[in-house]
Amino acid sequence: MPTAAPRWILHVDLDQFLASVELLRHPELAGLPVIVGGNGDPTEPRKVVTCASYEARAYGVRAGMPLRTAARRCPEATFLPSNPAAYNAASEEVVALLRDLGYPVEVWGWDEAYLAVAPGTPDDPIEVAEEIRKVILSQTGLSCSIGISDNKQRAKIATGLAKPAGIYQLTDANWMAIMGDRTVEALWGVGPKTTKRLAKLGINTVYQLAHTDSGLLMSTFGPRTALWLLLAKGGGDTEVSAQAWVPRSRSHAVTFPRDLTCRSEMESAVTELAQRTLNEVVASSRTVTRVAVTVRTATFYTRTKIRKLQAPSTDPDVITAAARHVLDLFELDRPVRLLGVRLELA
């Protein structure tokens, strides 16, 4: 059940998580540039960096970068394949440790979670954060950074200021002093495109956005304005739910070594992706309600289309046929670089 508005919210973010898990498995690589992604082969086409150690980041390597580009920037790096099972096990261990502390914990992924310190408790948030860092490091060998505030969005921003391996607290008292001169892109949910549109209005900083007339923003951007103004002024979501996170969908995608031009190859790939994804759904005792297919062409044009099933199902014939039907909704008149299947769940 959701808690009452907490006195403090702590955002716990594991540092360079995937790389850190790999370093625990390969201690001989400590202090060296490590890059995780694909099958660990930097010559493999169309595979990207999933995570880079801080030593690799010093060379400009970033998540999402093609492995080949990463290899050029940091030729001495060690490349390792992704190991989701190991990351999932490490994440579950950390979450269990957080819950053992007795606070509500809301998990947001492998490497991050929110923890609420409720009103009326004498616990000092800095001391709680220090205890969290100590427990996680001693029990798992993983380092984390922790942001502290009175809402989720501000706590997450504080975590970015705490990295790596630190603690940072943002409050009403220091919000504008710390954030006022930063670009609006520093706010959660404000991306590069929005930043450019705001710049055309002469709005470049968090301070300027916080003091912009709401009518001007509403006429330009619509209803999302209220959220931006809330974030710019340091506001945000104060609810931390201790309910277990339940996935709403399962998905798989594949980037092909060469672009596909043959429709039968595309159909085979979509069928295999649908079956693989369905196997995971069945293993988790869920049922499928909608089937989505994503197509990315050689020009990186990306579209997703979706179909609702007549009734929830886990029948392989129904699911794979639905995936092929959705694929048929695309013209497929250009070479295809990537295909993905997402199954939405009841």
Swiss-Prot record:
Pfam families: IMS, IMS_C
Keyword tags: Cytoplasm, DNA damage, DNA repair, DNA replication, DNA-binding, DNA-directed DNA polymerase, Magnesium, Metal-binding, Mutator protein, Nucleotidyltransferase, Transferase
The organism's place on the tree of life at top rank: Bacteria
Reactions performed catalytically: DNA(n) + a 2'-deoxyribonucleoside 5'-triphosphate = DNA(n+1) + diphosphate
Any one cellular-component term (Gene Ontology): plasma membrane
Annotated Mg(2+) binding sites: 13, 111
GO molecular-function terms, A-Z: damaged DNA binding; DNA-directed DNA polymerase activity; magnesium ion binding
Cofactor (UniProt): Mg(2+)
Enzyme Commission code(s) on record: 2.7.7.7
Annotated ranges, domain UmuC: 9-191
Localization per Swiss-Prot or TrEMBL: Cytoplasm
Protein name (Swiss-Prot/TrEMBL): DNA polymerase IV 2
Name of the coding gene: dinB2
